[in-house]
Amino acid sequence: MKENIKENKKTNTKAQNDLSLLFKYRKFLMGFAALWILMTHEWQIVTNETSFFFVTENFIKRIGFCGVDIFLLLSGMGLYYSLEKNPVSRFYYNRLKRVIFPFIIMASIVSQIDHWTNEFYFNIITGISFYKTNIYLFLWFVPAVITLYLFTPVFYHFFKKAENKYLFFAGFIELWLLFSLMARNVMREDLYGFTNRIPIFVTGFLIGYLCKEKVIKITCTDPQKLDLKI
């Protein structure tokens, strides 16, 4: 009887875990984030400047950078799941297939249209220009996430070994904060902006762990009181 109860509890973990909804609708949320980013870059304001809707439309357009943060958070979640079920070699192969190959193809097409030099093309596809010149030369987000992908298995290794995952996470964020303070006046401004998004990605990784390994219940009986149980 006790074994049946334990088995039922195990099989119902995902249903009980309120945070698992984030992973369930992760692709939908990523699509929303991508559209928000696109809106920031391409959307033309269509409402009258004197109307309330203009203020709202302009505000939503201006904070479209939040789409990048949403995307990184959800990417961190997905990578935890990926490393849980795949060896590191398979993990890297999947990133190569899904991200790097399409990036190289797109860069090759644009290089012909815009008449890039061979040196410029090489620097773009290898990420050299991302670190040495400017991150915004071409599809900056791809070299950014590739950088995160490269170091994620290392982070995962130490994260899994840590007895207290929350303390490990807090320690990592504190180390990042010290690095950020020291690099603020030394690092290029655009590159520094990218490093300031690392905590968002790592937070997504922690949420991935909570989604997969823990039972999270979020209850709100009072509009002014939110109860979180782990």
PLM regions: where:
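Functionally critical transmembrane alpha-helices in membrane proteins and complexes, commonly lining
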Residues: 24-82, 99-107, 131
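Aromatic-anchored segments of alpha-helical transmembrane domains
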Residues: 35-42, 107-108, 112, 125-128, ...
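Interfacial loop-to-helix transition and helix-capping segments at the boundaries
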Residues: 56-68, 128-144, 182-203, 230
